[in-house]
């Protein structure tokens, strides 16, 4: 069976809550938050695990939010490989407004990665067995260029990994230029 790995460069700890209504400048009383792991590749690994398969999620992790994210994935029995980062893992906020049924999604930028942190993530990728599937999904964090990502993809392909890219904009166009991608979304 093909081994599946995911790479998420901008993981998140997603929190969701509900409030009766939203209005400016007042205190908005909310329900107790619900926390879930987030980020493109992490969501892929969660789905594979939920369906009875096995996918290892590779991602950077920092601070208390990163620890909480890792604990939630452990609760779901999703295997992880992480690289400690200086910056805390981002936390997003989803708010459901009961009166209107509307949902507001506040998405923070991913934690910036240093060159060394990115290099350590790439080293983890390059230890994956040839023939394995690598799903790279999610947004790019500050400090990581499309060129950095495409070089990682090329190195992974040279290692014998089959790559799937789930991205948008410049990263998606660059993935098409790299070629030999199993699937692009």
Each PLM stretch: what is its role?
Residues 1-58, 67:
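Glycine-rich phosphate/adenosyl-contacting loop at the front of the ribokinase-like
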Residues 7-11, 60-63, 85, 98, ...:
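Cofactor-binding loop segments of dinucleotide-utilizing enzymes, especially the Rossmann-like FAD-
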Residues 23-24, 74-76, 99-101, 152, ...:
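Short, hinge-like loop/turn segments at secondary-structure boundaries
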Residues 26, 50-132:
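Conserved N-terminal subdomain of the carbohydrate kinase-like
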